Amino acid sequence: MKEIVIQTDKLCKSFSSGGRQQHVLKNLDLSIYKGDFTVIMGASGSGKSTLLYALSGMDKPTLGEVMYGDVKINHLGISDMAVFRRKNCGFVFQQIHLLDNMSVLDNVLACGLLVSRDKKAVAARAKELLGEVGIMKEDWGKFPSQLSGGEAQRVGIVRALINEPAVVFADEPTGALNSAFGEQVL
């Protein structure tokens, strides 16, 4: 039997709009299994990003539970949630926000060293991952302003993977990539 990584139980999320409740997620029961590639598709405004935020702990549901194994993440406090996300979740968004005053390599190391204190191991993994997405050694010292949109996106993907997260949340992760790199990333 496959291991469940994320499970929801009667997940609901509502927003107030103009004095009315807008129900975006209603009693959602969902199981995501280790090793699976799960895609959430829908029309604009259908709740995809709302679901991503709830599953990742970036926003609390109105009702229901989000569980990683036996950890009910929507009951974690702010600091515990931050630690949990750093160790268990990777994030790739269409708009990548790299740290402007840091090189490509330092942008990746900064994320890796939030979880591990083994700088040598983190650096080795960072260099390996950067190579896998086509960011070569001569580009590691570049700053974000010197990168193309696709290069910045690939650095963002490496940052999401550096800590070997249990789950990677991606919201249009290949939007800035050419088709060859888009296929490689997926």
Give, region by region, the residue ranges found by the protein language model.
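Conserved ABC ATPase signature
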Residues: 143-147, 151-153
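Short coil-to-helix segment of the ABC ATPase nucleotide-binding domain corresponding to the Q-loop/switch region
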Residues: 102-111
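Conserved ABC transporter NBD signature motif
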Residues: 64-72
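Catalytic Walker B motif of ABC-type/P-loop ATPase nucleotide-binding domains
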Residues: 168-171
